[in-house]
Swiss-Prot record:
Keywords: Cytoplasm, Endosome, Membrane, Protein transport, Transport. This is Vacuolar protein-sorting-associated protein 25. It comes from Drosophila melanogaster (Fruit fly). InterPro entries: ESCRT-II_cplx_Vps25-sub, ESCRT-II_cplx_Vps25-sub_N, WH-like_DNA-bd_sf, WH_DNA-bd_sf. Belongs to the VPS25 family. One of its GO terms (cellular component) is ESCRT II complex. GO terms for biological process: autophagosome maturation; bicoid mRNA localization; endosomal transport; endosome transport via multivesicular body sorting pathway; epithelial structure maintenance; imaginal disc-derived male genitalia morphogenesis; maintenance of epithelial cell apical/basal polarity; negative regulation of epithelial cell proliferation. The gene is Vps25. Disruption phenotype: Vps25 mutant cells exhibit multivesicular body sorting defects, with large amounts of ubiquitinated proteins detected on endosomes. This leads to activation of signals (through Notch and Dpp receptors) that drive cell proliferation, non-autonomous overgrowth, loss of epithelial organization, and render cells sensitive to apoptosis. Vps25 mutant cells display accumulation of autophagosomes. Bicoid mRNA is mislocalized in developing eggs. Component of the ESCRT-II complex (endosomal sorting complex required for transport II), which is required for multivesicular body (MVB) formation and sorting of endosomal cargo proteins into MVBs. The MVB pathway mediates delivery of transmembrane proteins into the lumen of the lysosome for degradation. The ESCRT-II complex is probably involved in the recruitment of the ESCRT-III complex. Seems to function as a tumor suppressor by regulating Notch trafficking, hence preventing non-autonomous overproliferation. May be involved in the regulation of autophagy.
Amino acid sequence: MAEFQWPWEYTFPPFFTLQPHEETRQQQLKVWTDLFLKYLRHTNRFTLSIGDQNSPLFHNEALKRRLSPELVLAILGELERSGHANPLDKRRQEWQVYWFTLEEYGNMVYDWVQETGQTNTICTLYEIASGENTSHLDFYGVDEAVLLSALRLLEEKGRCELIEMDGSHGVKFF
């Protein structure tokens, strides 16, 4: 895997401190949310823990600067508002982060189903997330928990039905 390319802001010490001026803070949060999504996609991760203070995402060792838990929460809050994250616990310490929104994932999967003529067939989540027929698509490699959440949205719209089989999930598309 190629080395992650950090944006120039990552080497700018004030970037690691929540800015007091509203416009500056909004721009800072925009850059951080983009950085979170790009970094997590690059590292193929879908979960974050606020307590993981040694992660390069939270800590620039060369600058000896680290994000405060408050700033991490502010960034994750922005990601939540844009549909790219949800807390996994009530204390909001563990988060699931989506490279695309759940609706975007659902639409990508449904488009693939339509294009490949798989309506009225049953697919496993593994086939969708990791199968050789999807290896060229943006949702390839998606965490199955994220995929399941996206498929639940499709199910609410009447586009599919989730089926549980021996503790694993399948899905029938309409």
